[in-house]
Amino acid sequence: MHKKIVIGKKDIVDFPQINLLELPVKIDSGAYTSSIHCYKATEVKVNGVKKLKCYFLSPKNKNYKNCIVVFDDYRTKNVKSSNGISENRYSVKTKVKMFGKLYNIELTLAKRWHMKFQVLLGRKFLSKKFVIDTSQSNLSHDNIIQYYTY
């Protein structure tokens, strides 16, 4: 018998490694990759090594002060957006905290300032871990763990 955690259509999660806490996220089974709002990403050299300097906005701070993170491990990938346009985006690996557990996640960096949710969790992350119940919300944030068994 197998079981997966039930997740709602939206939630609130933490990205502790990059100090972004209590971010509202949309669970998006239509998106393959997960993405996060990043208003600026710049490649920099530190001691001769290329790194990616990212400028995130943290909605937890009422003044929306900059959250700057430098990634050693990053890449670019081609992503097709919901409007069908392909673009190259930076991609980073970090951890997301949901249901009291840390999960590895790959996030593409996108300009989502005009979107309701700064973070989308896509199928690549969700598969084999979660089942979506669109009638529910904030199950992880409220620490309500339900299982779907099959």
Positions of predicted regions on the chain:
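Pepsin/retropepsin-fold aspartyl endopeptidases
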Residues: M1-Y150
